[in-house]
Swiss-Prot record:
GO molecular function, one term: large ribosomal subunit rRNA binding
Gene Ontology biological process terms from the UniProt entry: translation
Leader sequence segment: none
Protein's recorded name: Large ribosomal subunit protein uL11
Organism: Methanocella arvoryzae (strain DSM 22066 / NBRC 105507 / MRE50)
Organism phylogeny: Archaea, Methanobacteriati, Methanobacteriota, Stenosarchaea group, Methanomicrobia
Reported function: Forms part of the ribosomal stalk which helps the ribosome interact with GTP-bound translation factors.
Amino acid sequence: MADVVEVLVPGGKANPGPPLGPALGPLGINIKKVVDEINNKTKDYNGMTVPVKVIVDASRNFTVEVGTPPTSALVLSELKLEKGSGTPNTNFIGSLTIEQAIKVAQMKRDAMLSYTLKNAVKEVAGTCVSLGVMIEGKKPKEFIAEVNAGKYDDKLSE
């Protein structure tokens, strides 16, 4: 029977302290090796919180699976911001370009329920609503209406 430990760690900066150490300690594996592998696999997500799954089998071998950061973290990293707006409906903190929205959608594509790039970009726009981020200088809901009307079909074709 394999034990599974799921944690959120800073990309490329996991350490043996909480939350990893206390969760992995009782399993009897080399925590330093696990931390090194996590840091190696998450170095591309530097500055973002990344979901990580450590699977330990009965013979104390482990595998590390790295998820993608939340969509909100990817949007904020594209804009080089720390956090979203406290009042997202009235105070907008930045604006994504359509290209940035497509990039975020493609990074999250495997974890999304959307079948098409167009719908994936609309999911990203939905996240932008709660963050107080505009897209192409427009409120996210206006942007979604334009996407539905086909304005960006040339960029959203697969």
